[in-house]
């Protein structure tokens, strides 16, 4: 007897759990790079997020009268939690990641029926809710720890997240008192803030002299471009393993690069297109978030259109909006368009007459 089950169904012999584990593995280079440059807060936020996500998913599935272990074993909720944890500031208060994870799991996934039913990327739902609700906590980034006179230890990181103070009683601001205050933002934040008050090309050289951009005098936006390169390497690995398709990340990056390059010819406005590609969450979003098989387009042409749309939205938000990054908003806005994209890009069924022919 065959047992009939509802969608989503697994194809190509790849179990969902195996795919999720491959994606998590591909994120590890960026994960450890982020720890190297920004400290143990990344590790603690990830542990908090994964623990909260598992508990929330367990309760939600239990309330629906199903067996939680059958769903938790696919590791999808762990991946969602890890993506969210790596997207927020490493030393944000503990309640930020807990609230964000609950929103991601419950409002972004379970409210629609679970894995395969959600129209929006759950991690980005949680991230956007946090960004809108707690802008101060979500935009206060510690500079790379090698710029600090006293980098926080594991105990300091734990204490900062849960009490706001290190074990010696210092706040995050006090730890960075010897560095220009603008370094508590990301390079994209710094560039946008600086540009609003300086619009001359000569002023740009003053911007890149700031510690967050030059550090020891050789690194551009140190920490950030290394993390983006690590995400790029992990993304290429997933493409080679056929876990994700190349169309979405390539279309997204090429679209953004072309628009950013064209803008550069109109006059000095922002960082170069290359600098934009290795700053913020560009590579993270292109290879690990936009490629979510549940919320992205499923047709070959649709993937290209979807990726290009994400790249367009990122460009519009970064260059003409108030948010310096915009990857999360771009992906959610593009998720809205997926049903329409898939409808008009469905491959013609063999033997089915084309439009206008009988």
Curated annotation (Swiss-Prot):
Output the Pfam families linked to this UniProt entry.
Answer: NQR2_RnfD_RnfE
Positions of post-translational FMN phosphoryl threonine modification: 186
InterPro entries the record matches: NqrB/RnfD (IPR004338), RnfD_bac (IPR011303)
GO BP annotations of the record are:
electron transport chain; transmembrane transport
Q: Where in the cell is it found?
A: Cell inner membrane
Mostly located where? membrane
Q: Which residues form the signal peptide?
A: none
Tell me the cofactors it needs: FMN
Q: Where are the transmembrane segments?
A: 19-39, 41-61, 79-99, 125-145, 220-240, 248-268, 271-291, 297-317, 321-341
Q: What is its EC number?
A: 7.-.-.-
Q: Which domain of life is it from?
A: Bacteria
Annotated PANTHER family: ELECTRON TRANSPORT COMPLEX PROTEIN RNFD, ION-TRANSLOCATING OXIDOREDUCTASE COMPLEX SUBUNIT D
NCBIfam families the record matches? PRK00816.1 (NF002011), rnfD (TIGR01946)
Q: How does it assemble?
A: The complex is composed of six subunits: RnfA, RnfB, RnfC, RnfD, RnfE and RnfG.
Protein name stated in the entry? Ion-translocating oxidoreductase complex subunit D
* Species this protein is from: Haemophilus influenzae (strain PittEE)
